[in-house]
């Protein structure tokens, strides 16, 4: 790891932990040249996951799109920015597990199901908004079934 202060290439880790909420590792490092300390957070690279669309075409998975879709349905909340970030992180952890067993691919349908599952437990209003906005061919009967 390169020191962000002096750009020296040798640093040592003197404290390391798995974070409770994130799928990441927190590390406290010290530069061997200048002696300054800094913190890093290491997580898996999401660009290795591919999303299979409805037309069977694969495109890179985008955390930004996931977060924006959650933000757009939770704008009634005072903490919608922070909530969208943490929900996206929770959903992403589940998507990693899906992708691991399927050649690093996830379907659009599985992403939508994970988002709906998370929103259903977190915020009913956001769940209904997401369901009506992103579910194709949603009718009144199906909506009632989802709300039970």
Locations of the language-model features?
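Short metal-binding segments enriched for Cys and/or His
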Residues: 32-48
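Charged, amphipathic alpha-helical regulatory modules used
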Residues: 43-148
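Short cysteine-rich clusters marking metal-coordination/redox-active sites
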Residues: 3-6, 31-34
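Polar/charged side chains located within well-ordered beta-strands of beta-rich proteins
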Residues: 11, 27-29
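A generic structural signal for short, solvent-exposed coil/turn residues
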Residues: 3-5, 23, 42-44
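Short linker/helix segments within small regulatory modules
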Residues: 16-26
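Short, Gly/Pro- and small/polar-rich lid/capping loops
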Residues: 7, 15
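Cys/His-rich microdomains that often coordinate metals
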Residues: 10-11, 38
């Amino acid at each position: 790891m390169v020191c962000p202060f002096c750009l020296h290439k040798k640093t040592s880790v003197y404290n390391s932990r798995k974070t409770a909420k994130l799928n990441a590792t927190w590390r406290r490092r010290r530069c061997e040249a200048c002696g300054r300390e800094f913190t890093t957070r290491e997580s898996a690279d999401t660009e290795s996951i591919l999303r299979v669309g409805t037309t069977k075409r694969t495109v890179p998975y985008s955390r930004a799109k996931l977060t924006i879709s959650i933000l757009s349905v939770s704008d009634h909340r005072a903490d919608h920015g922070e909530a969208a970030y943490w929900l996206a992180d929770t959903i992403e952890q589940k998507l990693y597990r899906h992708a691991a067993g399927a050649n690093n691919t996830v379907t659009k349908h599985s992403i939508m199901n994970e988002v709906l599952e998370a929103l259903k437990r977190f915020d009913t209003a956001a769940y209904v908004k997401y369901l009506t906005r992103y579910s194709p061919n949603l009718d009144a009967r199906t909506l009632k079934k989802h709300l039970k």
